[in-house]
Amino acid sequence: MTNAVEDSGPRDLLFLLISTSRFNRYMPYYTMMAAVWATFIAGALKLQQDPESLSIEFILYKAGLCFVHCLLLCGAGNTWNDLVDRDIDARVARTKMRPLASGKVTLTEALLWMTGQYFLSVKMLDLILDGRNIWTLMLPLTASIMLYPYLKRPIFSKVFVYPQYILGLAIGYPAITGWASITGSEEPLGDIIKHCIPICLLVFFWCVYFNTAYSHQDSVDDRKMNINSAYVIAGQRIRLFLAFLSVLPLLTIPYIISTINSPWLWVSWMATWTVSIVMQIAQFDSQKLESGGRIHWDNFLLGLWTIVACMVEVGLQKVEFWKNVEGYIKL
């Protein structure tokens, strides 16, 4: 298992290591969404108070750093997941050809790759926060990433603890980093966390929803090996369960948008998500395992669209669009 495939050159090894991080797939890019959304929302709020307080270039720079930080940390987490799960992955049809499960990458190579990604992500966080509260934010996230693969073990299903919980927390938590990138020099960490609670809750519920749908693709193999996952709760009522889960993120979005109270975000975020998620549930077919993968992809597109929507809101606040509209209406 731990012997690398013979005659694999440096370029082949690099590609295999990138595969352990999932950088060649879209999934890791989910992890930057909470941080980037929070960066833009915090920036828009600050511009709403004083349009000259920040430049758009500064906000984009901080959002870019958050993107790189989250991606590197996710890459390290994915490599760690494959290290821990390599024996399980080798027995699952969808995962048996992963580099560690198939023996194409050694444990030493994977550990070095994981460590390099982790410390680069720490360096990015240092740049984002200007040296403040780095390990205060990094350690809880590190702990959740290390714990995640173990929550797939059947013992946790007995206490109704599922890996989707930790995944949701890990993907939502970087919202604090994003907000702190804008206001970290002005607000104490406790206040920043309070601002980010609605975003963290949204991403937590959202992640539990789309990851439960995605995990349903492996339900046949997972049941054979008694793998723990949230869809176990649903049994044969998986569609109804997903419908319930899909409502939870929709209930949290208004708490985020109301802080800015932007008509643009009510339409581009709240309305768009509502229509999309209703369509996802309507089109889901529990007899076609691949339909869970479709929900996962559709929500990735929703996340990307929300980044665009928040970027537009930053621009609208910078030019005082809503103040001008309000003044025009009063005339």
UniProtKB/Swiss-Prot annotation:
Gene Ontology CC annotations of this record: Golgi apparatus; Golgi membrane; plasma membrane
Cofactor(s) recorded in Swiss-Prot or TrEMBL: Mg(2+)
Keywords (A to Z) from UniProt: Golgi apparatus, Magnesium, Membrane, Transferase, Transmembrane, Transmembrane helix
Top EC class of this enzyme: transferase
GO molecular function terms attached to this record: polyketide synthase activity; prenyltransferase activity
Protein's cellular compartments: Golgi apparatus membrane
GO-annotated biological processes: mycophenolic acid biosynthetic process; terpenoid biosynthetic process
Domain of life: Eukaryota
Pathway field: Secondary metabolite biosynthesis; terpenoid biosynthesis
Cross-referenced PROSITE patterns: UBIA
Record family assignment: Belongs to the UbiA prenyltransferase family.
Protein name listed in UniProt: Polyprenyl transferase mpaA'
Species this chain originates from: Penicillium brevicompactum
Gene that specifies this protein: mpaA'
